[in-house]
């Protein structure tokens, strides 16, 4: 192998610096590969090897087959090495819990069938959207997926806190019993905070896939519409947020299905479509 290994045609790709460490640094005879030119290029992505079989991310080296691509089914927003721990993928469980609870509440917000009292969602929010999603998020952290763990644990906490609002034992609604205006403003700020948080996560998905990005972008808009609906006391805006929430629920189910369906168990697979900004990635 020459001192300058082959790189892709991407103009951002240059030769990687020396000092990489990987379990794949030695060939079958135990001979180390040639060192790469030493210049600073941390944070860039490179290809190397006779057939471009290696990926260099920062100062780490991986086989292409060892890397996870951006994929909604695993809640990985970008290239990531395979986790050290060997657990099943918890993302579909967390996404399913989020999707079903969002679907139920959003149908209530949209006033489907004339329903105005959302208390039926409390049980779902406590145990499926809350507890189960929180457990899935903790498992994501164990699998070294910071984004997935942050998202699932946070939205699990959202559903638990939302359920607490409608549980009389907490006394939250009772405190606003004589002041509906304060209740609407308080719920508006509550939902606005979640909108801001979700917009932050959306920025972290802009190099992933279309359905992955849409999940968080539309969810942020849903929170924003619901927040505005409470601030302005406009039922029409709240209903619009409910309709958009139903769309978000189906996108979450799609991403969950993408993480469950494989060639071994299904004839119908969910194909990831990368966003335009990721078409230059070297895979």
Curated annotation (Swiss-Prot):
<dbReference type="GO" id="GO:0008519">
    <property type="term" value="F:ammonium channel activity"/>
</dbReference>
<feature type="topological domain" description="Extracellular">
    <location>
        <begin position="173"/>
        <end position="185"/>
    </location>
</feature>
<dbReference type="GO" id="GO:0055085">
    <property type="term" value="P:transmembrane transport"/>
</dbReference>
<feature type="transmembrane region" description="Helical">
    <location>
        <begin position="90"/>
        <end position="110"/>
    </location>
</feature>
<dbReference type="GO" id="GO:0006846">
    <property type="term" value="P:acetate transport"/>
</dbReference>
<feature type="transmembrane region" description="Helical">
    <location>
        <begin position="152"/>
        <end position="172"/>
    </location>
</feature>
<dbReference type="GO" id="GO:0072488">
    <property type="term" value="P:ammonium transmembrane transport"/>
</dbReference>
<feature type="region of interest" description="Disordered">
    <location>
        <begin position="1"/>
        <end position="41"/>
    </location>
</feature>
<dbReference type="Pfam" id="PF01184">
    <property type="entry name" value="Gpr1_Fun34_YaaH"/>
</dbReference>
<dbReference type="InterPro" id="IPR047622">
    <property type="entry name" value="GPR1_FUN34_YAAH"/>
</dbReference>
<feature type="transmembrane region" description="Helical">
    <location>
        <begin position="241"/>
        <end position="261"/>
    </location>
</feature>
<comment type="similarity">
    <text>Belongs to the acetate uptake transporter (AceTr) (TC 2.A.96) family.</text>
</comment>
<dbReference type="GO" id="GO:0019740">
    <property type="term" value="P:nitrogen utilization"/>
</dbReference>
<dbReference type="GO" id="GO:0051321">
    <property type="term" value="P:meiotic cell cycle"/>
</dbReference>
<keyword id="KW-1003">Cell membrane</keyword>
<dbReference type="GO" id="GO:0015123">
    <property type="term" value="F:acetate transmembrane transporter activity"/>
</dbReference>
<comment type="function">
    <text>Transporter protein required for ammonia export and acetate uptake and resistance. Necessary for up-regulation and down-regulation of meiotic plaque (MP) component levels in a dependency on external acetate. Has a role in ascus formation.</text>
</comment>
<dbReference type="InterPro" id="IPR000791">
    <property type="entry name" value="Gpr1/Fun34/SatP-like"/>
</dbReference>
<keyword id="KW-0813">Transport</keyword>
<feature type="topological domain" description="Extracellular">
    <location>
        <begin position="111"/>
        <end position="120"/>
    </location>
</feature>
<keyword id="KW-0924">Ammonia transport</keyword>
<dbReference type="GO" id="GO:0006811">
    <property type="term" value="P:monoatomic ion transport"/>
</dbReference>
<keyword id="KW-0472">Membrane</keyword>
<keyword id="KW-0812">Transmembrane</keyword>
<feature type="transmembrane region" description="Helical">
    <location>
        <begin position="121"/>
        <end position="141"/>
    </location>
</feature>
<feature type="transmembrane region" description="Helical">
    <location>
        <begin position="209"/>
        <end position="229"/>
    </location>
</feature>
<feature type="topological domain" description="Cytoplasmic">
    <location>
        <begin position="207"/>
        <end position="208"/>
    </location>
</feature>
<protein>
    <recommendedName>
        <fullName>Accumulation of dyads protein 2</fullName>
    </recommendedName>
</protein>
<dbReference type="GO" id="GO:0005774">
    <property type="term" value="C:vacuolar membrane"/>
</dbReference>
<dbReference type="InterPro" id="IPR051633">
    <property type="entry name" value="AceTr"/>
</dbReference>
<feature type="topological domain" description="Cytoplasmic">
    <location>
        <begin position="1"/>
        <end position="89"/>
    </location>
</feature>
<dbReference type="GO" id="GO:0005739">
    <property type="term" value="C:mitochondrion"/>
</dbReference>
<feature type="topological domain" description="Cytoplasmic">
    <location>
        <begin position="142"/>
        <end position="151"/>
    </location>
</feature>
<keyword id="KW-0926">Vacuole</keyword>
<feature type="topological domain" description="Cytoplasmic">
    <location>
        <begin position="262"/>
        <end position="283"/>
    </location>
</feature>
<keyword id="KW-0469">Meiosis</keyword>
<keyword id="KW-1133">Transmembrane helix</keyword>
<feature type="topological domain" description="Extracellular">
    <location>
        <begin position="230"/>
        <end position="240"/>
    </location>
</feature>
<keyword id="KW-0406">Ion transport</keyword>
<feature type="transmembrane region" description="Helical">
    <location>
        <begin position="186"/>
        <end position="206"/>
    </location>
</feature>
<dbReference type="GO" id="GO:0005886">
    <property type="term" value="C:plasma membrane"/>
</dbReference>
